[in-house]
Amino acid sequence: ETVYYPTLDQYRVSSAIALQAVEDAPVYAAADGQVLSVVQDACTGTTVTMELGNGYQAVYGQLKDLTVAEGDTVKEGEVIGNISAPTKYYSVEGPNLYFAMKKDGVPVDPFEYLE
């Protein structure tokens, strides 16, 4: 889906969603899984990728104060960290949770899996 990014003043294709949030708000795991990676990304800041099983992964970005590390098993609803100040790529949009999902490495629409 093509999305307009006010900070960049341009449209870009994005398979993720940016959920407006309040800085320091807790971020909860959307499903049971295992933390596959924790990386620092210029666009999405501190980013956690969780393996959910059956080829599915969930990606959470714009985080700080993580409560999980690579290899940790996480239960649905468990706090994995807090919302950080936005990276420079989201400065106009403000604090947000970057959330994406993949199936077998291919981006899928997260709205199809969230209740």
Feature-to-residue mapping (PLM):
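Conserved, short, structured surface segments that act as functional micro-motifs
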Residues: 72-115
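Zn2+-dependent peptidoglycan hydrolase active-site motif and core
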Residues: 29-64
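Short glycine/threonine/proline-enriched tight-turn/helix- or strand-capping micro-motif at secondary-structure
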Residues: 1-28
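Short, conserved catalytic or interaction motifs in soluble domains
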Residues: 40, 65-68, 85-88
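Surface-exposed connector loops and short turns at secondary-structure junctions
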Residues: 25-28, 69, 108
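Envelope-exposed proteins and targeting segments
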Residues: 13-15, 23, 31, 44-46, ...
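Short, acidic/hydrophobic/Gly-rich beta-strand patch recurrent on exposed beta strands
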Residues: 8, 17-20, 47-52, 100-101
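Generic structural motif
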Residues: 25-35, 74-77
